[in-house]
Swiss-Prot record:
It comes from Chromohalobacter salexigens (strain ATCC BAA-138 / DSM 3043 / CIP 106854 / NCIMB 13768 / 1H11). This is Large ribosomal subunit protein uL1. GO terms for molecular function: rRNA binding; structural constituent of ribosome; tRNA binding. The keyword Iron does not apply. GO terms for cellular component: cytosolic large ribosomal subunit. Binds directly to 23S rRNA. The L1 stalk is quite mobile in the ribosome, and is involved in E site tRNA release. Protein L1 is also a translational repressor protein, it controls the translation of the L11 operon by binding to its mRNA. GO terms for biological process: regulation of translation; translation.
Length: 230
């Protein structure tokens, strides 16, 4: 049998994968077992009682994390005229139209979120094969195609997280950093759960929140008591 590394041995001793943790204990344990040299993100996986094979049960949207995510998002905006001015004033990192599209085509994608005014979609639509696979394509369902580009920029800068059920009906989202305290993580999780409740498909039957797991970028997954959300 291969010898366990010190980290693997430590995780085996401290983490009980069969246990359901309360949120405070889970956050404390994730911080305790984080041994990497960077501040790991705290990520949540929420198993929903939906059938993602049915188009009317795909859950997607965006949540502004009230306590931020610990990451300063870079925002690119496709807009012109007054909308472009509003985007710049709101703090957008890059604003443009055809010129910005040319940069994207060259592979210059130094941003985390893309916002577009409706009249800019004629330009953005040509970039689907580049932006789509990277999860950057603007979409009105998550508020990134909007005439109010300033608010979209402010939301992205404030820590807005976009989500969509994967093929197994699971939502994945970053809800903070490992140095966040439990109350900050809980506040962000509460906001996300609130939006998921609001977006529950009418055709979804039975238990909606089936399981919630917290993990860090490089750490173990801990099952969290989610009875308060049922």
């Amino acid at each position: 049998m291969a010898k366990l590394t010190k980290r693997a041995q430590m995780l085996r001793e401290k983490v009980d994968t069969s246990k359901v943790y309360n949120l405070e204990d889970a956050v404390a344990l994730l911080s305790e077992v984080s041994t990497v040299k960077f501040k790991e993100s705290v990520e949540v996986s929420i198993n929903l009682g939906v059938d993602p094979r049915k188009s009317d049960q795909v859950v997607r949207g965006a949540t502004v994390m009230p306590n931020g995510t610990g990451k300063d998002a870079r925002v690119a905006v496709f807009a012109q005229g007054a909308a472009a001015d509003a985007a710049k004033e709101a703090g957008a990192d890059v604003v443009g139209m055809e010129d910005l599209a040319e940069e994207v085509k060259k592979g210059n994608l130094d941003f985390d979120v893309v916002v577009a005014a409706p009249d800019a979609m004629r330009v953005v639509g040509q970039l689907g094969q580049i932006l789509g696979p990277r999860g950057l394509m603007p979409n009105p369902k998550v508020g990134t195609v909007t005439p109010d580009v300033a608010t979209a920029v402010k939301n992205a800068k404030a820590g807005q997280v976009r989500f969509r059920t994967d093929k197994n009906g699971i939502i994945h989202a970053a809800i903070g950093k490992v140095d966040f305290d439990a109350s900050a993580i809980k506040g962000n999780l509460d906001a996300l759960v609130g939006d998921l409740k609001r977006l529950k498909p009418s055709t979804s039957k039975g238990v909606y929140f089936k399981k919630i797991t917290l993990s860090t970028t490089m750490g173990p997954g801990l099952t969290v008591d989610h009875s308060a959300y049922v």
